[in-house]
């Protein structure tokens, strides 16, 4: 016999709990949400899922595809300004993309250059 001593979690230990639904089918589910940010008063509407700013995930082609489904992408911080120029010209993507920056002075200056050139991007991801 093996005795398991580690903590076991159940529904009383989680923040999200299932609740009764009046929906007849999963097709009726609407994932789109509308948020108003407390300090900027910016309103964003979409599906609140963000693709990470990891290599291979936070790429421009991924951002374009996910934006068509109203999902967000945090671009990797390695993108050059010329790469961002290609997506900045497509206005429908601007509220679906977060520009990424590290915490170094160089990263901060790079982010400021991008924002100065393309001020219509609304979101920033700070990679620590």
Residue ranges and their predicted role:
Residues 1-128:
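Active-site entrance/lid segments in N-terminal catalytic domains of soluble metabolic enzymes
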